[in-house]
Amino acid sequence: VPANWPRSRSEHFKTLLKARAIETECYVLGINCVGVHDDTYYSGDTMAINPFGEVIKCVSNIQDLLVVNISNDVAEYREKLNTNKDRRPDLYKKFLY
């Protein structure tokens, strides 16, 4: 997720990234600006988050390269949580038109 969040909203950026990871059950990478541009301060907060919303690695206040290892445990987690069984395609048609 490329971003341009100022330092004053850093916590919003981090919270939204964690929420995206949890709701999609996917790894999420958030890449944010760092430094100063036009009198606006950016804290970076570039981070990798696992599908449980846990921060794997984060880089703040410096320009850096983030390298992370990810596991394939997500497939096993998705099987256990199987939200697809809750789908109701029979109801979708009445909401499409």
Locations of regions flagged by a protein language model:
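C-terminal beta-strand edge segments of enzyme domains
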Residues: 33-97
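Active-site beta-loop-alpha substructure in enzyme catalytic cores
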Residues: 1-24, 28-30
